[in-house]
Amino acid sequence: MSFTDKVMTPFTPVEVEKVDGKIKVSVIGRTYTIDNGEFFSSIVANGEELLASPMRVVGTEDGEEIVWKVRRTIIQSHTNERAIIVSALESKMFDLNISYEFNYDGLVNCKLRIMTTSYNMAQRLRLEPWPTWKYQLEKLWIEVPMIKEKTSLYSQYPRSDIYQNGEVLYKNAAVRASGDIPEGNIHLPFKALFWVGEDERGLGFVCENGKNRQPIDWKHHVELEENGDERIVRYRLLDSQPVTWDDPRHDATYFFRPLSFDIGIMATPVRPAPKTPFIHNAIQILVNDNVKELAQPIEGYDNHFDFLKSLGITTLVLHETWNLVQNYPCLDQETEASFAWLVKEAHKREMKVMPYFGYEISSLSPTFENDFEKFRTKPRDYFMDATWWRNPPQRDFAVCQNSEYSDFLAEGIQKLNEKYPFDGLYLDGTIYPRGCVNAEHGCGWTDPYGNIQATYPIMGARKLLQKLYSIFEPTGGIINYHSATLNFVAMPYTHMGWTGESIQVDLIREGAGDFPIGFAKTEWTGRNLGVAMEMIAYPNPPKWTIDHATGLGLVHCIIPRPFYPRMNWENVKYLAKIRKAIDKFPFEKADFFPYWRKNDIVASNEQVKCTYYVYEGINGKKQILLFCSNLSTKEALNVAIPLDGYEMKVLNTNAKVNDDGSFDFGMYQCAIISFTER
């Protein structure tokens, strides 16, 4: 397919500057500095420093702390797309080589190679005595001292329990995939993706596998340790002599092979965050063999298209059932005819169409036997195979993005788009990097004890998104990611995220009463990552209603996307009213004030949270868009919100029906039931 490796919009070429021994590498919104040390001395993201002190490689050799001497740091190559820098370090007994590949989107692929040092020439000629080194490497860690106030939030994958002092602090749960970092020190098992930051910026770490790692135990692959004004992110690579170096031969200089450790580092946001958090007004619709029902009259309109247009809908998101064969990009005749008609009718009304493509290969696919084994994700545990069932009756199996399926899917989508130009993609789980041991496409690896371990296809998902982005970005299309993890490595090549589905089961069953707000602050605002967000919500009254979803969402800059028929038309119209009120506000010129920061506008009842945007016009008058929500399970009565100094006529444009709130001398008075918005 036509895929470019060139710098794509909105990114800028990689810039490299070497001054006084410092090498600065800048990409859009971020700067990494190597200052003659063993790792980064500075990482600036979104205008602010993340590191409290330089990153470091910590180790112990023969019982003594390793002291590294940096011998050379070299700019190996530099193009618009990437820069490669290598560093050579040595200690008393070991040599360390580090290779950095800086990509224009901000991902830095780091490779550490440690090996035993050799004898110098004088020792070889017996002019100096041979050293009696044991070459014992008892410890090797990477430590990242971050500014503590920049590390209030986390995100993890694979999801697991979170431990403190060896005991479970948080049980593994969907709502614990991301959240507030607790006080004290914590430790976690292996993480393929790990992000630490706050609501405007952060630092991500990526490891596709755990090759050569020997932490003290499986619960201590990653640690967060408080140290005054620092929070240290620690990767325990080794806590004992490498098993592969367990060699009876005496001359370790020749018989101990280099150990390699790969770790990717990526400061966020991965692209400039959009000024407006609401980049389109979409509805997800369930279409299959009844697609022509969209041509039927509804609510006094000649057809569904005109009705949706009247509600302000700009984008039709097609549920998976639009394609009779799940995810197969070569459409059958019936699906192709329906899709061509739908795109034509939507475009007549200047509405966009985003069809669904997911993460599976279908048993209904005509090439299933040929493709299944080589494309599929093969988990370590056979019984953990990810499958789906849908009508017409078919089984759908998760594919691995490290396989050739990625090329097959991208090429099929490109051909379909050339034939019936559409406006973007609804990617369901496509960038979710399931652990895979399928050797047919290169996944899986064997540890020193003979056990097969999983590869997490993070880079494969990233490459697929790069290909799809190159198709749709030039024409103004929208690519979403919809995943149960924050795969920040692939996010540069998306425009928005659709979040919330992974936690719907909990919300549907239990309601939002115990919802950990840290999850929302991490995954919903999008400002820390650089992409707009939209909520997927499936109401289940009375425990989980559209009111609850909207109230929980708006104070985190996210709004539920209507989904018909899972939401009735009344819910769709309700959300449309809110969107029409929101769309009047000039987000591009406004400042953002989330409730979790110290702001001027605070409700009299601490149960009620206020998030708002302020725009000051050329006449000096301030306009405000204020979202208030009671994030508790109790009703908040007689709530007062101070709004003196703002244009009340703007504030009084309240999207709620039958608003019984009132303004009195710059104070807004109202009552708010639990988990609803004003």
Language-model segments: residues:
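Active-site-proximal substrate-binding groove within the catalytic cores of carbohydrate-active enzymes
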Residues: P457, R462-T653, F665
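Aromatic- and acidic-residue-enriched segments that line the glycan-binding/catalytic groove
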Residues: P329-A337, I361-W389, G435-P448, Y493-S502
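Beta-strand/loop-rich accessory regions of lumenal/periplasmic or secreted enzymes
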Residues: S2-F256
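C-terminal beta-strand-rich structural cap/linker in extracellular carbohydrate-active enzymes
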Residues: S260, N658-R678
